[in-house]
Amino acid sequence: MVAVLFIVFLVALAIGVPVAFSLGLASVAYMLGAHIQMINFAQYFFKGLDSFTLLCIPGFTFAGNLMNQGGISDKLLDFADALVGHVTGGLAYANVLASMVFAGISGTALSDTVALGGVEIPMMVNQGYDVPFSVAITAASSCLGPIIPPSVPMIMAATMTGLSVSKMFMAGIVPGLLLGLGMCATCYILSVKRHYPKRDKRASLAHVLHATKEAIWALIMVAIILFGIMGGIVTPTEASIICVVYGLFVAVFIYRKMGPKEMYSCLRDTVSSASAIMALVAFANVFAFILTKEHIPSMIADAMLRLTSNKYLILLLINLFLIFVGMFMETIAAILILFPTLLAVATAVGVDPIQFGIIVVMNLVLGLCTPPVGVCLFAATNIGARYGKCTLSDSVKALVPLLIINFGVLFLVTYVPFLTVGVANLVMG
């Protein structure tokens, strides 16, 4: 019956059925064939949703939508440009810096690409950067969204396996910063080599102060999330609710851009995004129940450990496998299906679960800007094509130097535990 489970799942995916419903159809087919009472389907479906931690997903999504409604993308980019726009390749740095701050609000990569890309790409093109490079740095920097907290994929990974969401958030900070610094270094080298422009002089103090004043409301939200969770003052779910109240206050009373029409748009987008994730979680929990019942995770773990018991080689194999999976499968779906199984392998060779969670998230998130199914790359390319010649192959060529740096940081995080779990333990004890 295990063969039926996987055949139905793969066939459903192949004919275009959404991942969540493919998992559900495969689970139903297995249960009917194995004569398992369907009440088990309902029980495990709702058990997957019965989590206080999962409430922070609609919370952070709604808070990000509220802030974005106030035009936060323009304000963040202007703030970043005021700080670094005067150096060679300054606007490329500003692109990365804005994504790092926006990551602390949205928690997703695609929202970063769409919200910031519509502002960043035309601004870079107008200042003399070529379109493919503008697209590449926008797509690559948007991958910081699910790595710098809050992170929806991290919430999923932690919830599925009973790990601490707060600790995983803290473990993602240093890898996110390293990715940002690596991208900035790459931008500098390419900017010097290609003679990309820079602003003639530093922004005036008045301009910097004005840009900071405009962006301060977004920076405060990031501080609420990081320091509230890091200090043990609030849980991630409580932090998300505080951010919703704060975001609503800023959108209505500070930015003054929130009317009934805008509120409806924010609520609609939040419900659409959150419900899709929740459906995936619920169906994946039923699928995971079947895999556990058939001892699939332990069989995979035993097979890999028979191949080699070397921790470093196991991590290398898992990295290569996840990079491949990330090129084809949506991040959250891959985490829900694969993470519990691979975690059993990793812990068997002595890898810390929190460190492994960051490794898995980074691998799959980097797939968002790699072909053939890199949604962030597609979105950024579509935006860039409005402002000049830019095909998908052009974007991929421009992306290669950034991907080399990103994968370099990934392997550094894989083999230096202090960068993840070490920092988390220092901060949270």
Predicted regions, residues:
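Alpha-helical transmembrane segments of multi-pass membrane transport proteins
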Residues: 1-429
